[in-house]
């Protein structure tokens, strides 16, 4: 990976925040990401889903047929960590259908890094010759 390619892929070098959300809140956030507008060409935000998360979304039912993390269903009351860049943090309600006030009730919000690009650059420097496979983290059914 050339540095210019990295900058092209990550043109906005924001801070990265860690939020704590309940399983019920996380499911609501994911439902918002997968709303009909996301598949109709309207402007929506779409996110990277972490390794271990598996979602099978039925568009016709508007529901998850499967929603697991590390092979286990999300627990509605358990707290999960979610990382977002500053731009998304500043627009939580619009982009993820959760208010900052709701998130703050779950615990202190932390800044993990002041530069998302630096984190990725460091990872790529330390972990060279990476390969990729399609894991099927998100499956969308009609």
State where each predicted segment sits.
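Catalytic centers of hydrolytic enzymes
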Residues: 1-142
């Amino acid at each position: 990976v050339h540095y210019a390619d990295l900058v092209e892929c990550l043109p906005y070098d924001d801070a990265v925040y860690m939020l704590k959300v309940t399983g019920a809140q996380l499911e609501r956030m994911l439902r918002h990401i997968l709303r009909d507008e996301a598949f109709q060409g309207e402007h929506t935000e779409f996110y990277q889903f972490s390794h271990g998360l598996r979602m099978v979304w039925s568009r016709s039912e508007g529901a998850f047929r499967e929603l697991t993390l590390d092979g286990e269903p999300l627990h509605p009351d358990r707290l999960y960590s979610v990382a977002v860049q500053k731009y998304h943090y500043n627009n939580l309600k619009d982009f993820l259908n959760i208010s900052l006030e709701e998130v703050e009730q779950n615990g202190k919000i932390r800044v993990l890094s002041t530069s998302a690009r630096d984190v990725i650059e460091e990872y790529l420097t330390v972990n060279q010759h990476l390969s990729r496979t399609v894991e099927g983290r998100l499956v969308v059914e009609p």
